[in-house]
Swiss-Prot record:
It catalyses: UDP-N-acetyl-alpha-D-muramoyl-L-alanyl-gamma-D-glutamyl-meso-2,6-diaminopimeloyl-D-alanyl-D-alanine + di-trans,octa-cis-undecaprenyl phosphate = di-trans,octa-cis-undecaprenyl diphospho-N-acetyl-alpha-D-muramoyl-L-alanyl-D-glutamyl-meso-2,6-diaminopimeloyl-D-alanyl-D-alanine + UMP. This is Phospho-N-acetylmuramoyl-pentapeptide-transferase. HAMAP family: MraY. It comes from Pseudomonas putida (strain W619). It is an enzyme of class 2 (transferase). Belongs to the glycosyltransferase 4 family. MraY subfamily.
Length: 360
């Protein structure tokens, strides 16, 4: 929106041409979203408290979590609002990738909103039935996958890139749709499973989103892409504005979500942010790198799968409780220790992911 204004004003002063730089608009995206989140946060928390939109806590969970009951939830709406406004202000609104990621994010956020709303109304932690949640995730995920497949200008946009191996690529063809579906839906649910402790999900999301922003910037520049031997995806660089907005909104939300949390993001935030990460990774052809950088999300998801499979097959549990962050809590780790150690692991994994740019 403001990019169009800047383009118009260039005829009066050449200084407005500076807004053509992606790096500047990415930074402005961060600052705008951060400012919005910090400004609107207190108002949203008060509104949620007044309307008694509080978190329902599982009775079979860690006893320390019972004190969290009633903490305002659905704070993810704050994150999505800040991301949306900042992106609309600073991104090129003629870019199809910007709209694809925005729409997918908001649609998955809508699923989460319904889920959270039902939890609040029914005053339990069940929410939207799983079958309906996965149905709508599948509808939106498949729609995005088919759209990206049909609008891909070249086969580069539908080829799987294997990190660390410069000459290994796998043409996917129609298999791109299947992979994209699993990446988007899987990422959405993985972030949601991780969102069980104060600040646990949002900081890894910010770190992974920031790293993906770097991939977007490099993949959208033909010279950088050729030099680094990564896919050149025209237009993908514009997603650095969205990634910047995600960083700013995430950090602004963390201000209120840090231990002890004043507000929880809820499914409206977790499902949306996970879907956003998955969609961005697909666009810049870095699905495997997302798997590496989002290792905490993967670990949380695998712990649930292993726990359920083990209990159904043998009647025994592998972990004291799943997702795995609860396992460490029940082992006696204080909540802040679990959170910070998971953050540290994410820093390491993100650095490994970024290292794939040169280690080939």
């Amino acid at each position: 929106m403001l990019l169009l204004l800047a383009e118009y004003l260039q005829q009066f002063h050449k200084g407005f041409a500076v807004f053509q730089y992606l790096s500047l608009r990415g930074i402005l995206g961060v600052l705008t979203a951060l400012s919005l989140a910090l400004w609107l946060g207190p108002w949203m928390i008060r509104t949620l408290q007044i309307r008694q939109i509080g978190q329902a806590v599982r009775n079979d969970g860690p006893q320390s979590h019972l004190s969290k009951s009633g903490t305002p939830t659905m704070g993810g709406a704050l994150i999505l609002s800040a991301i949306g406004i900042s992106t609309l202000l600073w991104a090129d609104l003629s870019n199809r990738y910007v709209w694809t990621v925005l729409i997918v994010t908001l649609l998955f956020g809508a699923i989460g909103w319904v889920d959270d709303y039902r939890k609040v109304i029914e005053k339990n932690s069940r929410g939207l039935p799983s079958r309906w949640k996965y149905f709508w995730q599948s509808v939106f995920g498949l729609t995005a996958a088919i759209f990206l497949y049909q609008t891909a200008p070249t086969t580069v946009e539908t080829t799987l890139i294997v990190p660390f191996l410069k000459d290994v690529t796998i043409p996917l063809g129609i298999g791109f749709v299947v992979l994209t579906y699993f990446v988007i839906v899987g990422s959405s649910n993985a972030v949601n499973l991780t969102d069980g402790l104060d600040g646990l999900a949002i900081m890894p999301t910010v770190m992974v989103g920031g790293a993906l922003g770097i991939f977007c910037y490099l993949s959208g520049n033909v010279k950088f892409a050729e030099y680094l031997l990564i896919p050149y995806v025209p237009g993908s660089g514009e997603l650095i504005v969205f990634c910047g907005a995600l960083i700013g909104a995430g950090l602004g939300f963390l201000w209120f979500n840090t231990y002890p949390a004043q507000v929880f993001m809820g499914d409206v935030g977790a499902l949306a942010l996970g879907a956003a990460l998955g969609t961005i990774a697909v666009i810049v052809r870095q699905e495997i790198v997302l798997f590496i950088m989002g290792g905490i999300f993967v670990m949380e998801t695998l712990s649930v799968v292993i726990q359920v499979a083990s209990f159904k097959l043998t009647g025994k549990r592998v972990f004291r409780m799943a997702p795995i962050h609860h396992h460490f809590e029940l082992k006696g780790w204080p909540e802040p220790r679990v959170i910070v150690r998971f953050w540290i692991i994410t820093v390491i994994l993100v650095l490994i992911g970024l290292a794939t740019l040169k280690l080939r």
